[in-house]
């Protein structure tokens, strides 16, 4: 597979304006992502690259309860319960996990006014301690590091997902997009130090049932958060959007 250019200049050309469109976007246009530092993990809801974090009271309350966090260290897995905070779901993490994962539960989305079946929206988030170690996928739609520099893999229901569009947001919020190869892998240059958040989306038109209700289509969005200690100093994230 071919990797994205190692030159940071394409990133600089990809600066996104943070217009008020984010405030008008439906909830399922958002993402959830994990941050972890000092034994305290946070699951945020919004848009990392726009520095938008939904709050409680507010759109954060639309989820069906507090998602459980799965903590994995080596082959050991542990379930961690959390609490709803003002800016996200909060968790206390023990030790030094290799990866954290959370899948949030959102009510089925009624699309009957458009003569469409109900939509099952599944936002999920993964955090990894580094990119040098491969992580096994566990979610229906998962995005994991392969252990090779700058390489990631997208898996859907246990199989590599080719031609999936993966967006990587740098610590500044600047984004690049690349498509997975036939084996589900994709590569990015990561020239800056700091926190990155990658995202992949996938739609499945297979009908199913969730939360005791039937749906006609499923929409998955999964993020992967990692922090790099080495690299160039990065500009800051943009100022948060005005309250909405």
Predicted regions and their residues:
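Beta-strand-rich domain onsets/edges
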Residues: 29-40, 113-150, 212-244
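N-terminal, post-signal-peptide region of Sec/Tat-exported proteins
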Residues: 49-90
């Amino acid at each position: 597979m071919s990797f994205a250019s190692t030159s940071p200049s394409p990133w600089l050309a990809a600066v996104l304006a943070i217009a008020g469109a984010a405030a008008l976007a439906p909830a399922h246009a958002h993402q959830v992502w994990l941050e972890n530092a000092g034994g305290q993990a946070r699951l945020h809801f919004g848009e990392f690259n726009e520095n938008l974090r939904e709050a409680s009271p507010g759109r954060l309350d639309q989820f069906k309860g507090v998602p459980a966090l799965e903590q994995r260290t080596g082959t050991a897995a542990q379930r961690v319960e959390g609490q709803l905070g003002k800016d996200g779901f909060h968790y206390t993490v023990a030790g030094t996990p290799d990866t954290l994962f959370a899948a949030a539960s959102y009510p089925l989305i009624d699309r009957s006014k458009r003569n469409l079946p109900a939509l099952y929206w599944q936002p999920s988030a993964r955090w990894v301690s580094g990119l040098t170690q491969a992580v096994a996928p566990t979610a229906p739609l998962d995005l994991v590091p392969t252990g090779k520099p700058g390489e990631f893999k997208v898996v859907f229901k246990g199989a590599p997902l080719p031609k999936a569009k993966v967006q990587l947001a740098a610590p500044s919020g600047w984004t690049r997009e690349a498509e997975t190869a036939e084996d589900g892998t994709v590569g990015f240059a990561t020239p800056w130090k700091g926190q990155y958040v990658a995202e992949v989306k996938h739609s499945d038109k297979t009908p199913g049932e969730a939360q005791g209700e039937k749906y006609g289509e499923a929409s998955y969005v999964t993020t992967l958060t990692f922090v790099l200690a080495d690299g160039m100093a990065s500009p800051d994230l943009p100022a948060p959007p005005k309250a909405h």
